[in-house]
């Protein structure tokens, strides 16, 4: 997995390379900011601004030595400006100084982020799949905050108006804020149950993409590919978990069957099948705990 360091990235990357890198780093950066500042909405806005800056600058100026650290630093400056503005507007500098850590007003240096090497993607997934949220809200928030899809893309995938999807995501964020959920992994005693919720959400995203429940398209590739990408991210953090490996195996094997699904002979496509076999890493036997997709 990329750690945002210079060894993985070449300077002068093209626009498509930058877009792919930003998509991968976005949840890591958002997780780092939420962990530090504990303001989901403000952190997401700050990350989006940093991503826009990077999308403009990096194709022209080349990648920074530590792309993830660059994004965290730029986004941190945005959210610090937001915090200061809020404190000034509400005239609560003294009381805020008590509740906000002293280092919250200092953006971390890129080297600090590189040294920490912490990937908060899994923690962010747990937060987006908080049990207080309804399944539709869990799906929408996961695709927005962790998947990096725009509200318009999510609305299009589920064939609802963009305004409706925006309200759903906004209500989900407000609900999480109201519960006071801390940005940390669930306690050991709750982790297995919470992980099952996360995996169920990823399975629902994949299933909706593989067999669309509405619209003219039989298959929505943006959803299946996103579900596979996020499940891979979970497996990187939990390489020994059989349920995670089983779900990934099911997704890869099912997706490998898709090109032949509407073909004339219904046979396997060798190239996708080889990809699936490599990707499962011998874990396909664990997929039996998940319902097979038609």
Locate predicted features.
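The N-cap/first-turn positions of alpha helices
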Residues: 26, 136-137
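Short alpha-helical segment immediately N-terminal to, or the first helix within
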Residues: 21, 32, 140-144
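Short, charged helix-capping/linker segments at alpha-helix termini
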Residues: 10-20, 30-49, 57-66, 162-163, ...
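A short, charge-rich alpha-helical start-of-domain segment used by transcription regulators
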Residues: 2-3, 8-31, 41, 189-200, ...
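C-terminal flanking helix
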Residues: 26, 30, 37, 51, ...
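Residue-level preference for hydrophobic side chains embedded in well-ordered alpha helices
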Residues: 21, 25, 29, 50, ...
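Σ70-family region 2.3-2.4 aromatic/basic alpha-helix that recognizes the −10 promoter
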Residues: 48-55, 65-94, 173
């Amino acid at each position: 997995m990329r750690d945002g360091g210079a060894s993985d990235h070449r300077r002068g990357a093209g626009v498509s390379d930058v877009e792919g890198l930003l998509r991968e780093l976005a949840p890591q950066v958002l997780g780092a900011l939420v962990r530090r500042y504990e303001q989901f909405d403000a952190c997401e806005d700050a990350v989006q601004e940093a991503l826009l800056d990077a999308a403009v600058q990096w194709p022209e100026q080349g990648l920074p030595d530590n792309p993830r650290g660059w994004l965290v630093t730029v986004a941190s400056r945005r959210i610090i400006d937001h915090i200061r503005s809020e404190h000034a507007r509400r005239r609560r500098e003294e009381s805020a100084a008590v509740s906000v850590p002293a280092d919250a007003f200092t953006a971390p240096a890129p080297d600090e982020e590189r040294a920490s090497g912490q990937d908060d993607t899994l923690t962010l997934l747990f937060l987006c799949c908080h049990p207080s949220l309804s399944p539709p809200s869990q799906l929408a928030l996961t695709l927005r905050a962790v998947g990096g899809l725009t509200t318009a893309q999510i609305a299009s995938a589920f064939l609802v108006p963009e305004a409706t999807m925006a309200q759903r995501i906004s209500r989900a964020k407000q609900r999480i804020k109201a519960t006071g959920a801390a940005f940390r992994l669930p306690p050991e005693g709750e982790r297995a149950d919470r992980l099952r919720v996360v995996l169920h959400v990823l399975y629902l995203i994949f299933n909706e993409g593989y067999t669309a429940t509405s619209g003219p398209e039989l298959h929505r590739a943006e959803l299946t590919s996103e579900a596979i990408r996020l499940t891979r991210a979970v497996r990187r953090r939990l390489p020994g978990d059989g349920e995670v490996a089983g779900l990934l195996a099911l997704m890869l094997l099912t997706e490998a069957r898709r090109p032949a699904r509407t073909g004339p002979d219904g046979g396997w496509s060798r190239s996708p099948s080889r990809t699936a076999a490599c990707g499962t890493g011998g874990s396909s036997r664990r997929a039996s705990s998940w319902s097979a997709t038609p």
